[in-house]
Amino acid sequence: VLAIVPYIILQFKGLGIIVSEASYGSISSTAAIWIGAISLTVYLMISGIHGSAWTAIVKDIMIFIVVLFLGIYMPFHYYGGLQPMFEAVHQANPTFLTLPKTGLSISWFISTVMLTVLGFYMWPHTFNATYSAENENVFRKNSIISPIYTLMLLFVFFVGFTALMQVPGLQGAEADLSLLRLSIQTFDPWIVGFIGAAGLLTALVPGSMLLMAASTSLSKNVYGVLVPSATGKQISILAKCFVPVIALVSVYFTLYGGNTIVTLLLMGYSIVTQLFPAFIFSLMKNNIVTKYGACAGIVAGIASVMYITITETTLGTLFPALPQIIKDTNVGVISLFINLVVLMVVSLATKKIAAQPHFESGAVDGKQIL
């Protein structure tokens, strides 16, 4: 849930930006966030996962059309082609298309991608999508279609490169406005509205899945454990009650937080990646990790992520004498390392306790406990 909240904030921030810009400022970002949060909460409580699934289909089709069109049209409209666009960007800023030697360097990029990949399937809403699949053929189709999403990023980059020259001066959080600002100065309002509608769905669909995953996790994995006598119906009702609560918390941090969309996404991934070590060990036949070790490692990893994020700590500030290539490594690696160390130490210390029949392993009613 701690990892999901920054991700929900990301969706609300994007929603506010899209509505405000697409309406040419007639609707404020704050009003858009509140309207979106309320609509999303009501929509989710009524329709559930099936409503989100059908909306996702419409969203995917619209966003594919918009991204493909903008990625091809923008470079040719402003520069006459892709090569002239890259030449113009290089002439204006020769180092823009390369990673810097320090800071956000190659080592930072590689380590960030690694952490993101490890955390991708740790998101609860990803598991929801997996478990709700009709049959195994759905996974085969997704394996074929999924690379298209990666290909779409190429056209997003083209739009970004175009905006670099045509919408200059966007610094910090304003960089999130680049696509819509460029669209507004290029197209008629009705086209901007279509682009905004596609963008709106890209915020609402993941937002609904995230809210559902967070509320379900709290009701089933927290309340359900604390109150074992709770029935499935009670847990289901409580999950719906958690939806507006989580939405309100997310709206608060959306309005009073200053992080950019990319920063929020990376922070969420840094937190959820802490589930990866315990998950991998759980798949092993001879699992040496105990539930105490897994929980301790996750808590230690998340605590270090929160501390690092709040204090803006980097490997360079912790170990200034290290080579630059190591200092630039994503600091989330430290949290993952702390997680692994604590996980192994606590597991070894509690191995004898966990081996007792009434704990992690053994038989209850003739069934093996995993």
Predicted segment positions?
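Membrane-embedded helix-loop-helix hairpins and adjacent transmembrane boundary segments
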Residues: V1-L370
